[in-house]
């Protein structure tokens, strides 16, 4: 693939050992795809599949009235255009949504006619509420803020078998249970109790013997026994009986009597164990029946009812034990054949038979009544109610739905194949088979299920969650419609009279606004956005809760491989419950996570890629991505490391079915951005992955010198950068927009051949960081589709750049880097390397109060002239003003209640209508501790209220900008069209034209240049077809002009109409402040390997350790932070970063060399750097100009990529270091022979340190834990109500907690007065603290400590236990 426009400018050298077989898929595909299927907006009505909105509608409609004479049918639905676009919704605080209209049909039947006849049909479109739309980057704008719907990992519907691990019963006996979980409907559980009786329960209610359920589905005791047991057949004789001999049932049993063959020879003596030889002898003797004594039958259980054939009298019932009297009665009635249940103690337990004994119901009706009584205790069981309840439990499609997934899981677990064939409700067979499998488990055959296996957990994505909410809304509507349908005929109602869209809107609004899975988007940087959208949570409605989730659920499971990242998960109570999707993972049609593998055909690894789910994967042997292959794609080694069904093993290549796609396939996006991840301890890698998401975008992003090669994918997929939608020529570039004239071959006929990209300028993100886009193309550049045109926050030339490359020295420095503290050079701060811009939004509203409206004005009494200077005539601050704490941003006055008026004054007021004369100043001021620059002001005015000048000027600006966009489009379209017309006209003969063009003359370029272009249309061509083309061109141009005018009008209408504001609000003004935050002590910083710390001191450059050539270190870290934490990746990163910088320096030296051979030398050096190891780069493709541009971009360091688990080896790092620092340079810089360490000098004394120091470049981040946001000082502030102690935290203006351990410290030093002060007057001694204040006022510095309030609370709590506790003062 050729390099794209931006890739050419700076090629990342990759150390990967293998080519990519498959590119990383689009990272937001899951979210976008899911919502697309939910809406199916672009799909034609006829082609819509039964999913999403369509499925919700079809499952509820048709709605039939109670009497069946009217029904409401669903025809189709359509989504309208949203009124405002995303940006406008964010500004106005609206939801980005489009109106949903459903076409429904009301059918009324004729009551007079006996057979159903349609009387009339009414069809109508009905508004069904607003459906939020997803933005192109996979988020939603709800009430003006961006939100993300996180996918949920929940237990898949289906049937699951498990046991209690011996925890229930004291003996440690395993109690097996089964559970049928539907997508929606009642849960059905089956469970054994310690006595081996099998029970069932519905929705965790009271348990009942399982045979009640079997009888309720129409089985008799005989059929139940026939289903679960094999029978032994006997024929009674006058003494004893003959028994059918089945050899396998006798093996290992004790003979209770002598067993003889036909000749009467004893083969097995009494009380001997029967073995295989005995059975062989019996079989060879041709024995089919053996005679057994009478007592052998006693205690056996009858399989069928025994009935006297003559009288029809029942002698014994099925499941009765055989006794002497039963046998006598049978002989008397001449019933000699009998069948008993075959059971044994080992693997044929009599469980169902025992259960049947405990069951007291007689027949199907009694069983159903028993179930009714359990479900609805206290209600009288009428026949209809009992019948209806039982049907609704598991057999009605309205109340019970297994879903396709559930049906597939039930089928596959019960051994009926892996497809979703069958009804979506439970069937009798399902229930029977489930019980059968459970009994087999108790008998010791089969395996229980692992509920943490990813084949038993599925992902519910946005679309599915939204569909469930929509359906819930529709169900509420259905109830209301049913009520009204009865009146539809008499009152001549239309469909829109029947349907009220409120419940639907409410359900949708509630889900998107306040569901646990709808979260405020984490927008700190592009990575945090992308990770948030790829997150998979086990929490939420229908999921787990933090408190109940055990260790197993949170643990890493073998099936997570390639599906869920084993590294990235939060620390703390949510660990393991919130996960991130792996890099290549995607969802299959059933919602299970699947991961790609390369298929192996005839021992060769092919390019065919198959996606396998966790269930499918268990059938195959899968090799790892780093297995060595030869040129043909065959395995080199005799034994290959593989995985099969979650176990790792070594096996011969012949047995291997699949191979991993890439080494990075097992980790998530954030983890795959950590270079040398394979050398880091997993706990630290987890911190590293999580902390990258908190990196604050710096003022000037800088690409990481050592990356992993996935930075570009992340930056582009996150939507932070601007990508070209179509290729073309850059026509115009400024800071706000990029205009591209599209290539002819990519332009669709009839469309405008212009793409205008408006860039986002200084916009506030959800986390108050700054989102700003900068163009990286120049006018006249040729770009292709997909090229990066502009960088966003934290991206550098289309690559993710979260931090800065810092020169790091690992050495202690006077205790300033003790315990993870960080020592930083002043130069870093002076160069604004870690300066970030944060944008604060301050809002003020003018309300209509009882005493009159509040007013936004400049006319405020007692305001200093310096304050007023910043406000314009409307009382709103100018853009660009620098403000600090307590400065007025918007002047506002509120009428204030008068003191009591005399009746005369009241009367005068009433007559002359004078409003309250007194007003108080309630202006918007800058909060304490904030300084910044005003960068934007937005004014929203209610409909019907006159706009002030400021609001009008803002609208005019906006319109001017829009007009300019339209003019640009028009200019390019017209130029393009006139170019074509010119080609058409030149050289053609004419019948006449402007400027007295004679008939028969030919048109020349010079002639056309003299005319105004619109006069060209007046030329009358003699050739008829060409004249038609000219006419069409004119019409198309005029039509375009008309379209642009319409668009402008539309925009103007939108801007000039009043804004929707909350009730009682007349005006709302938002002021945006840009706050510059420089790095300062107390800020948290971190590398990408979990090596975090807090800045302890910013040291002057001249005091920092420096190298022999005078280069000073930027950051000094403590070397003790590495060994115990086992994140050695940071050391390797430092070495490779050192090499990258050195190579860049060598290229810079070459560029300064102004000789002719310059390009040749640079080419040769670049070839050496890029193409000696790793996947290589195609330097030869580049022209000389491109090579020079590339070299200029590499001066500050050659970017390296060391992909996860496939990165640079030690030898490669050494080789790069040698390329970067030839002997003469190494000698000059006093590097050690390995080039990985250098001799440093103390900046303060100039002395050499006594041993060489590891030094190099690391990509270091500033995290979103800034001391400015955390530090505050409490004077007297709020106290907690009960304990009367100061509150904690900055928001509450709280104090510092003086806790248990701090008290111990004071006690240890015997500082009793300080201790007393801390625990009383500085905390919760109410009288004491007021007293101290008084004393200070009087100038008397004495403390009178009293009783702390918390002690009184303790006394009161003890009293609440009815213990009277009093203090005796002595």
Curated annotation (Swiss-Prot):
Please give the CDD domains that the UniProt record associates with this protein.
RNA_pol_B_RPB2
The kind of enzyme this is, by top-level EC class, is transferase
Short name of any one Pfam family annotated for the protein: RNA_pol_Rpb2_6
Q: Which reaction does it catalyse?
A: RNA(n) + a ribonucleoside 5'-triphosphate = RNA(n+1) + diphosphate
**GO biological process terms on file:** DNA-templated transcription
Gene Ontology CC terms: DNA-directed RNA polymerase complex
State whether keyword Transcription applies. Answer: yes
Instruction: Cite a single GO MF annotation.
Output: DNA-directed RNA polymerase activity
The alphabetized UniProt keywords are: DNA-directed RNA polymerase, Nucleotidyltransferase, Transcription, Transferase
The record's EC number reads: 2.7.7.6
Q: How does it assemble?
A: The RNAP catalytic core consists of 2 alpha, 1 beta, 1 beta' and 1 omega subunit. When a sigma factor is associated with the core the holoenzyme is formed, which can initiate transcription.
Q: What does this protein do?
A: DNA-dependent RNA polymerase catalyzes the transcription of DNA into RNA using the four ribonucleoside triphosphates as substrates.
Q: Which family does it belong to?
A: Belongs to the RNA polymerase beta chain family.
What name does the UniProt record give this protein?
DNA-directed RNA polymerase subunit beta
What organism does this protein naturally occur in?
Answer: Bordetella avium (strain 197N)
Q: Which gene encodes it?
A: rpoB
